[in-house]
Every structure is written in structure tokens, then in C-alpha cells.
């Protein structure tokens, strides 16, 4: 499972953005602002909800291996004869703040599949809704992710024809 919300991860997240706000590091400041305690930035919901990319029982990566990807369970569990994909958009709505010690769980469901032929190839848009909840069952965030899964044209000439 995923790790609990903790100060070190919050600090590292903020350091990379060179951003400081007392509610993310100081108990009194967070309480003065109306929170129950130190909170995590809302945009960390996915960070705290995702399990590990690699576990000790997994094989070690070798030179030339494809990089590990974030597990997107529903969209890529749908059987489709597609070889490529890209994310087109994500919408996120935030609700209950994440506090130190919270354990975030993600529940995913497929919303729809819309078949479409685009310049890059024939494929389908798949939309997935992820609901992030804490250990108390409170909704932290809801996101809707759209990914286009497709097969590219057989050859470059066909792709060039589509551009004109």
C-alpha cells in the first residue's frame, strides 16, 4: 500500500517547488488557519495514494528496460489492441485536507470509452475517475483522467497524408 502522509515527503515536495507556507510545517500555524494540524498540499493526494513503483520482490531493472510507469489500473486493464497512449487531460477537485498520519486510498472506475480516429492513429479516449479517501472514509479528492490509447498508422506516408 501507499505511505502515510508525513512531514519529510511534504518538505521534499515543497523544496522542489521552492515554496514555503507555515501550514505545511508548523502545527500552531496550521491550527491558527483553522486546520486540525499540519496539512499536506492538496496536490499531493496522488503522491500519498499511489503504492510503490518497485518492491524488493520485483526484478531489478536492466539497461534498455522501459522505465516503470505509474499504475493506472482501470484504463490499462481494459483489453484493447493498442500499442501507444498519451494523457490528454486531468481534472481534480479537492475536499478534506490531508493531515499528518492520514492513509490515502484510491478507488478507480471507468467512466466511458469514446472511439475516435485522429492524426496519430485509430483509438479511443478512456476516462477514469479516481476517488481519494482517508482512513476515516472522508473524500480527499476526486480526479478524472483522460487517456487516448491508439495504434499509429502503418507507415509514415499514411501519417503525412493525414496531416494534409
Could you describe each region identified by the protein language model?
Residues 87-164:
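HotDog/MaoC-like acyl-thioester-processing domains
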Amino acid at each position: 500500500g501507499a505511505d502515510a502522509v508525513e512531514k519529510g515527503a511534504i518538505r521534499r515536495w515543497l523544496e522542489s517547488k521552492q515554496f514555503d507556507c507555515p501550514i505545511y510545517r508548523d502545527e500552531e500555524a496550521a491550527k491558527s488557519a483553522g486546520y486540525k494540524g499540519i496539512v499536506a498540499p492538496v496536490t499531493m493526494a496522488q503522491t500519498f495514494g499511489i503504492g510503490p513503483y518497485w518492491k524488493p520482490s520485483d526484478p531489478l531493472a536492466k539497461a534498455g528496460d522501459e522505465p516503470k510507469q505509474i499504475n493506472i489500473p482501470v484504463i490499462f486493464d481494459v483489453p484493447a489492441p493498442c500499442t501507444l497512449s498519451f494523457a490528454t487531460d486531468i481534472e481534480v477537485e479537492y475536499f478534506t485536507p490531508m493531515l499528518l498520519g492520514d492513509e490515502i486510498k484510491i478507488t478507480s472506475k471507468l467512466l466511458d470509452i469514446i472511439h475516435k480516429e485522429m492524426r496519430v492513429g485509430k483509438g479511443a479516449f478512456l476516462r477514469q475517475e479516481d476517488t481519494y479517501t482517508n482512513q476515516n472514509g472522508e473524500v480527499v479528492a476526486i480526479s478524472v483522467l483522460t487517456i487516448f490509447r491508439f495504434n499509429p498508422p502503418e507507415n509514415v506516408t499514411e501519417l503525412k497524408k493525414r496531416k494534409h
